[in-house]
């Protein structure tokens, strides 16, 4: 198998750990053992100078917290979508929940400085759902992406708790700093901060590492934003006035 195929296999076991009633060909304990064994082999190949077992043990220790976070994401989707008939439906049928669940796993590996694997996980979710979440993004509990297609969340984005995004939202970089030789300066904060209890409607674009959307705010559809917004704000574009004329 290729590396992406092997990572897809690991990801399948990771989903079984977090949603055993849906993805569980193995029981949860068996899935944890499988993901640990497979992941340790890949980490040993990619990080020959590091202790692969120590890395995987640290990842494994974080799985209960990841499970808790994912459960809050399921609750947020069920509570926030009147079309949701059950939490089981959310887990089985909502692409946003799938993408966020994969992100929660990939983010833990990113935090452990594991190369390549988190990005492959993110791209597997991207190809399946149309939702592109960089594994470096920090996302609080009760996160819900409704519909999902076309959502982009950048590496240094920080998202608070109880945030909801709709399709086509971009949380991206505004511009990239270059050094004296013209090469990009990496490792800088490039993506926005979204505080608690924010709703961002379809096709809104929020850019820049110094941009903060204050808590309890709403960002309307198709808004293009590169400036910070105070808490309890509603941001929207002025509606164009339609011209109605007789065709006679």
Tell where the protein language model's regions lie, with residue ranges.
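Left-handed beta-helix
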Residues: 129, 134-135, 140-141, 146-155, ...
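Terminal amphipathic alpha-helical/low-complexity segments used for targeting or macromolecular assembly
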Residues: 1-123, 248
């Amino acid at each position: 198998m290729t590396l992406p195929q092997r990572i897809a296999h690991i990801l399948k076991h990771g989903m079984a750990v977090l949603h055993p009633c849906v993805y569980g060909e193995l029981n949860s304990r068996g899935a944890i053992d499988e993901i640990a064994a497979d992941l340790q082999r890949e980490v040993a190949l990619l990080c020959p100078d590091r202790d692969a077992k120590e890395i995987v043990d640290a990842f494994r220790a974080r799985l209960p917290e990841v499970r808790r976070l994912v459960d809050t994401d399921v609750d947020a989707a069920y509570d926030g979508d009147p079309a949701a008939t059950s939490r089981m439906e959310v887990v089985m049928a909502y692409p946003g929940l799938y993408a966020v669940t994969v992100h929660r796993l990939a983010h833990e590996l990113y935090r452990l400085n594991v190369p390549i694997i988190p990005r492959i996980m993110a791209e597997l979710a991207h190809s399946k759902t149309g939702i592109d979440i960089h594994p470096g993004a920090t996302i609080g509990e009760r996160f819900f992406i409704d519909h999902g297609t076309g959502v982009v969340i950048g590496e240094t984005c920080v998202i608070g708790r109880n945030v909801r995004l709709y399709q086509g939202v971009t949380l991206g970089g505004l511009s990239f700093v270059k050094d004296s030789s013209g090469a990009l300066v990496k490792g800088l904060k490039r993506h926005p901060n979204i505080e608690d209890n924010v709703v961002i409607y379809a096709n809104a674009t929020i850019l820049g590492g110094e941009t903060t959307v204050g808590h309890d705010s709403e960002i309307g559809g198709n808004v293009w934003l590169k400036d910070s917004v105070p808490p309890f704000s509603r941001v929207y574009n002025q509606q164009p006035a339609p011209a109605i004329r007789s065709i006679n």
